[in-house]
Amino acid sequence: MKNWRTLILGLVICANTAFAAPQEVDKVAAVVDNGVVLQSDIDGLLQSVKMNAQQSGLQVPDDSTLRHQILERLIMDNIQLQMAKKMGITITDQALDKAIADIAAQNRMTLAQMRSRLAADGLSYDTYREQIRKEMLTSEVRNNEVRRRITILPQEVESLAKQMGNQVSGDTELNLSHILIPLPENPTQQQVDQAEDLANKLVADIKGGADFGKLAIANSADSQALKGGQMGWGKLQELPSLFAERLQSAHKGEIVGPIRSGVGFHILKVNDMRGADQTISVTEVNARHILLKPSPMMTDEQARAKLEAAAAEIKSGKTSFATIAKEISQDPGSAMQGGELGWASPDIYDPAFRDALMKLKKGEISAPVHSSFGWHLIQLVDTRQVDKTDAAQKERAYRMLFNRKFAEEAQTWMQEQRAAAYVKILDGSNAQPQ
C-alpha cells in the first residue's frame, strides 16, 4: 500500500476546511443538477493535491490546469453523491469506523497515531472521516451501477483459465501509471484526430524525459489523474483486454500507447513488474465421528461420559469405531457408514470439530469434543494433498474477467453520467460544461 499520506489525500473528495479562507464569502463554482461545487471545495483540494504531490515527489502543472482537473473530479463526485441519496445508499458509522481502522492497520498505525498524523498535516479527523464516508458512497454507487452492466459467460471463464494454464506469465503483476485523453460520445473525426495528436505528443514528451505524473495531472481524464495517474499493482489478466494485449511483452520502464478505446486514447507506463507461478495444493482429510446430541433424556455430562466409554472400548480392541458408530451415533448422514465422513477440506467443519481433527495423528481418536451440533468422538483416518490448480485458475479467471470488464465499463458509465448531468460552470471556472 502507498504511504498513508498518499492514501488519505488520494481519497479527498471535498474541500479541507483548514485550507479555506474564512474571511471571504464562499462562492459557487459550478451547479451540478441539484447540487453545487463551492470555490472552497476547489481551493481546499488544490492545496491538498499540491501537498500530496510534494510529499510524493510528483511535479504538478500550473494552477489553471490543476483547477480544471479538480473541478471535473468534484463534479463527478457530486453527481455520484446525488445518485447515492436518490438510491437511499448510506454508510453506517460502524462501517465507516471499520474502514478507517483498516486503513490505519494496513499502514501499521493505531487510530490515535493516525489522528496525530492527520493533525500534523492540517487535516481534522472529523473532516477526514466525512471524506472517507463520501468516497465509500461514490464507490458504492459506481459498483452497484457498473456491476449490473457486466455479463461473464461460462465459456469466457473456461477460455481464460485455459489461456492462463498455457502462459508462464499468467500471474504477472505490473505497477502501472495511466493517462486517458478522453473522447466525447459520438466524436467527430476532427475530435478524434485532435485527441490522437495530443496523445502522440504526450508519448513523445514522456519518451523525451517529461515527467509522466505531471502530464497525467494536467491532461488525464482518468480517476487517478490527481495522483499522477498511478494505478498501483495489478495482475496482467485483470487489466482491460486492450491493455493486456499490448503489455504481454512489455518491460519495466516502457511507455505503451496511445491505445484507442471507446472512451479515448490511453497511455501506459510500466513502473515495475513482478511474477508468481504456483500450483495450488490443499490438504483434505478423511475422518469418521460419532455424534451424541444432548436432550432432556441425555445431559452434556452423560453424552461426554458415553463417548469416553466408547473410546475406551475401541482402544482396548473390544469393538471397532465403525461398529459403535452404527450403534449409537445420532448423525443420520454418517452413522450407517460407520461414522465415515469421506474426503473433504477441514474448513467445511464446525470450528471446534475442525480444530480437534487437525491436532490428531493418522488413526488417532480424540477426546470428546463439543461443537454447535453436540458431542463428537473423532478419528482421523487419513490425509492427502490435492491439486486444486484447475479450480483455482477458474476462480481467478472469473475474478480477472470481472475486474477487466469493470474497469472498461466504469469509465464508460462515468462519461455517460457526466454527459447526462446538468452542469453550469460559473465565474469562468475550468471545466467542460454540458
Swiss-Prot record:
Signal peptide (residue range): 1-20
Entry GO CC: outer membrane-bounded periplasmic space
One annotated GO biological process: protein stabilization
NCBIfam families: PRK10770.1 (NF008038)
Domain-level remarks: The PPIase activity resides only in the second parvulin domain. The N-terminal region and the C-terminal tail are necessary and sufficient for the chaperone activity of SurA. The PPIase activity is dispensable for SurA to function as a chaperone. The N-terminal region and the C-terminal tail are also required for porin recognition.
Subcellular localization: Periplasm
EC primary class: isomerase
GO MF annotations in UniProt: peptide binding; peptidyl-prolyl cis-trans isomerase activity; unfolded protein binding
Disulfide bridge map: none
Family annotation (InterPro entries): OMP_Chaperone_SurA, PPIase_dom_sf, PPIase_PpiC, PPIase_SurA, SurA_N, Trigger_fact/SurA_dom_sf
Gene3D superfamilies associated with the record: 3.10.50.40, Porin chaperone SurA, peptide-binding domain
Source taxonomy: Bacteria, Pseudomonadati, Pseudomonadota, Gammaproteobacteria, Enterobacterales
Gene encoding the protein: surA
Protein name: Chaperone SurA
Purpose of the protein: Chaperone involved in the correct folding and assembly of outer membrane proteins. Recognizes specific patterns of aromatic residues and the orientation of their side chains, which are found more frequently in integral outer membrane proteins. May act in both early periplasmic and late outer membrane-associated steps of protein maturation.
